[in-house]
């Protein structure tokens, strides 16, 4: 082999799953949790291997190198077993399944193909004329085993394997040629703008972090240009082969657009860099209902027969894989746009997507994040303050007692064994319910886990035969809940609290609550080379470092604001409070008067954020009465509890329109309008934040408080103060978005004056002034007069 030639590596499993797939997408059976990725699956593998005797060699690493046109293809894998007897050498491939073995009439084509690849590699290494393949299927619940044996002539097997490799060669060649062109283009790009204050330091910090394969936490205020300052050094690093692929991860759709624009800006310098933006299945699906099977969806029928051609053509023609481009290609080739997009993501240089495609155990891109060791991935994690709560959600799971009874009622007539399994779980939940008053923390639920595994097996069997569409959908939804619960249960550790509680609607739930998501997030981060967490509100940074990664030597940088603080007025109203003991009509009237006087001081657009809908409605009522008794004209818009996309757009559109009177938007702190919206210049000149943002007391928050207290940390801060302050910082950040913006930020709660509140203020809030209701209007008038003078 020519050592100077570039090398393309691929696993045997990925090779056969990609080249040899065929047929339809069909989600009508659960398919089971992947037993290969579960601890139970691994245990069964080891148990079978131990039982096989002295002529059985377990976990045999295999690899072969093939000289291709201009590159070397290295194919690697690990056979579950290799059996050497006097009569024959045989490769053993073990697969755990949930369904009954009498339903396994023959090995799955992909499973057998994987074993045949291993067999061909062994036959070539050992110079064999003939070799056997044994497919071992083990039923996960009963541990019953069923085997299929085959014998192959080595020359025939090699011809088959060579054909698989030949089909893959064009894909490997594309990788080599594109990488060469891409890296050459990266050498020529420069930072596309004059550096703002702190921006060069930020970009250098990102590059050094990638170079050293570390993690970096960035606290950088609005206006620094975080997106281009992270994307540019990451692209440069890819060009220097410090990483293979950039994952730009976001919590909201709007920030994906900003990332797309950053890559597009670099393309103006002739950068060659293929980037895909992934859209949720429900949004990109062509059908009215997302029903992924060949009977309901024409794009699912024969999808795997056509998708590789669709992907290859797209790679040859496009560098920007936007939603519109993906939809057009999917329609042209009559394939599922979502599944095609996931395939395209394998081949591109950058993936812009939601957090869940990397971190969520139910949604992550398995092709990157489940098999094998680390890839050369660079994670750029935007608005990273969101990842704590999102992480808790992704790694937690719950089951409701009432759902077991509902499914039992549906199936008991035709599936008594299934109903019996459901009832066994229901009895355990009933016993838990009798011991629970409000909520109850549990030490051990292993007895429930065993019964739940039985339910999963029976659900899988039931779905194979169920023909009633409505019943199937209900049972399938239940199946996914159980599967998700078991996957989380399989990884329970000291970062979890298991508890039961009654929900507000009276339903009784058992919850696996991930109180600290750091360890789970770290497992995903370990699949990459480096990660950069950035946000305008990553304060206090030690809190986020502790909850987003388990590593102790992560870097952190604090970038100073580039904005002129003279262009904004920051005040704290110290004569009001949202404490429960202080809430009264008189206090609501006081808040209403604050709003009125601030807006009266300067006509324009304002957002007012409240701690809850109830509080907002009470103050809104007082404000409308105040407005009715005055000649001042103001237009009001108010956030509703459940707003569809059109209603959200209408709310924001009101701020885009010119008018001859003030506009006041009433919203909820931590809601859809207090984060991620960009209202520049005159579109927003003031924000009033009512309350400290503390989450409402609930079981979950109290569990967090107790957990972190026991860890020797300040539980109240972790459960309440830090999440609350983040909401305040985000809401305040809506006002000054560009260096030309001017505006007022008013924090309305006396508790901001306490040391605990002030110590987590950002540096640029050092000029926060105290104010009272009787002087607020005068202070604001003076501020705006100074702006006019300037």
Predicted feature descriptions by range:
Residues 64-158:
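Mg2+/Mn2+-dependent nuclease catalytic core
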Residues 230, 257, 261, 333-350, ...:
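Signature of the SF2 helicase/ATPase Hel1-core->accessory helical subdomain module
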Residues 183, 189, 242-351, 359, ...:
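A substrate-engagement module of RecA-like helicase motors
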Residues 176-219:
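Conserved pre-motif I regulatory segment
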Residues 211-233:
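Walker A/P-loop
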Residues 326-351, 362-369, 461-577, 586-589, ...:
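A contiguous, basic/glycine-rich beta-loop/short-helix subdomain that forms a polymer-engagement track
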Residues 1-87:
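Metal-dependent nuclease catalytic cores that hydrolyze phosphodiester bonds in DNA/RNA
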Residues 574-586, 639-752:
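Conserved RecA-like P-loop NTPase helicase motor core
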């Amino acid at each position: 082999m020519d050592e100077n030639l570039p090398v393309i590596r691929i696993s045997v499993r990925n090779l056969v799953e990609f080249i040899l797939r065929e047929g339809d997408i069909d989600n009508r059976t659960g398919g089971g949790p992947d037993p290969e990725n579960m601890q139970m699956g691994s245990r069964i593998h080891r148990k079978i291997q131990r039982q096989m005797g002295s002529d059985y060699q377990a976990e045999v690493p295999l690899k072969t190198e093939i000289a291709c046109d201009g590159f070397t293809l290295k194919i690697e894998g690990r056979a579950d077993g290799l059996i050497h007897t006097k009569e024959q050498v045989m490769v053993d491939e073990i697969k755990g399944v949930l369904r009954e073995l009498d339903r396994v009439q023959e090995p799955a084509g992909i499973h057998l193909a994987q074993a045949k690849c291993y067999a061909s590699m062994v036959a070539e290494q050992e110079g064999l004329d003939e070799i056997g393949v044994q497919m071992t299927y083990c039923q996960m619940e009963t541990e019953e085993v069923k085997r299929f044996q085959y014998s192959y002539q080595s020359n025939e097997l090699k011809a088959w394997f060579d054909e698989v490799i030949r089909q893959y060669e064009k894909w490997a060649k594309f990788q080599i040629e594109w990488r060469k062109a891409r890296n050459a283009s990266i050498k020529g790009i420069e930072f596309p703008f004059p550096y703002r204050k702190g921006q060069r330091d930020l970009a250098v910090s990102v590059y050094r972090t990638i170079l050293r394969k570390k993690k970096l936490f960035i606290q950088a205020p609005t206006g620094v240009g975080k997106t281009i300052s992270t994307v540019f050094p990451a692209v440069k690093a890819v060009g220097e082969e410090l990483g293979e692929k950039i994952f730009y991860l976001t919590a909201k759709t709007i920030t994906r657009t900003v990332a797309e624009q950053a890559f597009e800006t670099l393309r103006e310098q002739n950068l060659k860099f293929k980037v895909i933006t992934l859209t949720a299945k429900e949004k990109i699906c062509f059908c009215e209902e997302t029903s992924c099977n060949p009977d309901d969806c024409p794009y699912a029928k024969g999808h795997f027969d056509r998708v590789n051609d669709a992907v290859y053509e797209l790679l040859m023609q496009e560098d920007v894989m936007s939603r519109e481009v993906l939809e057009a290609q999917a329609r042209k080739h009559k394939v599922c746009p979502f599944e095609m997009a996931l395939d395209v993501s394998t081949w591109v240089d950058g993936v812009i997507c939601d957090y869940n495609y990397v971190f969520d155990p139910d949604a992550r891109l398995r092709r990157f994040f489940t098999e094998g060791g680390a890839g050369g991935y660079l994670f750029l994690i935007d608005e990273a303050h969101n990842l704590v709560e999102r992480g808790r959600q992704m790694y937690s799971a719950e089951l409701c007692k009432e759902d077991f009874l509902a499914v039992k009622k549906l199936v008991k007539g035709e599936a008594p064994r299934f109903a019996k399994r459901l009832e066994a779980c229901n009895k355990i939940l009933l016993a838990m319910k009798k011991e629970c008053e409000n909520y109850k923390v549990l030490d051990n639920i292993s007895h429930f886990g065993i019964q739940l595994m039985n339910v999963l097996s029976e659900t899988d069997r039931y779905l194979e035969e169920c023909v009633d569409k409505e019943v199937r959908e209900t049972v399938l939804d239940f199946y996914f809940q159980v599967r998700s619960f078991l996957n989380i249960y399989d990884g329970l550790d000291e970062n979890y609290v298991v508890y039961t509680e009654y929900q507000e609607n009276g339903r009784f739930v058992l919850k696996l609550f991930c109180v600290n998501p750091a360890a789970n997030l770290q497992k995903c981060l370990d699949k990459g080379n480096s990660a950069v967490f950035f946000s305008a509100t990553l304060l206090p940074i030690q809190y986020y470092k502790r909850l987003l990664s388990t590593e102790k030597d992560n870097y952190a940088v604090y970038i100073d604001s580039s904005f002129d603080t003279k262009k904004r007025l920051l005040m704290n109203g110290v004569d009001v409070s949202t404490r429960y003991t202080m809430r009264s009509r008189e206090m609501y009237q006081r808040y209403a008067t604050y709003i009125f006087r601030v807006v009266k001081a300067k006509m324009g657009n304002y957002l007012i954020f409240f701690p809850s809908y109830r509080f907002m409605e009470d103050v809104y009522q007082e404000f409308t009465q105040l407005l009715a008794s005055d000649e001042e004209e103001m237009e009001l818009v108010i956030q509703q509890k459940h707003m569809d996309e059109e209603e959200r757009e209408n709310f924001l559109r009101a701020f885009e329109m010119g008018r001859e009177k003030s506009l006041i938007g009433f919203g909820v702190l931590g809601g859809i309008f207090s984060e991620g919206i960009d209202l520049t210049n005159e579109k927003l000149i003031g924000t009033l934040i009512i309350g400290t943002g503390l989450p409402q007391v609930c079981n979950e928050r109290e569990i967090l408080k107790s957990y972190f207290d026991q860890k020797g940390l300040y539980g109240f801060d972790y459960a309440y103060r830090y999440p609350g302050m983040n909401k305040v910082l985000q809401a305040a950040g809506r006002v000054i978005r560009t260096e030309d913006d001017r505006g007022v930020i008013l924090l309305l709660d006396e508790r901001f004056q306490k040391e605990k509140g002030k110590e987590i203020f950002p540096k640029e809030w050092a000029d926060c002034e105290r104010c009272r209701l009787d002087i607020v209007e005068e202070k604001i008038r003076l501020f705006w007069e100074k702006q006019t003078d300037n």
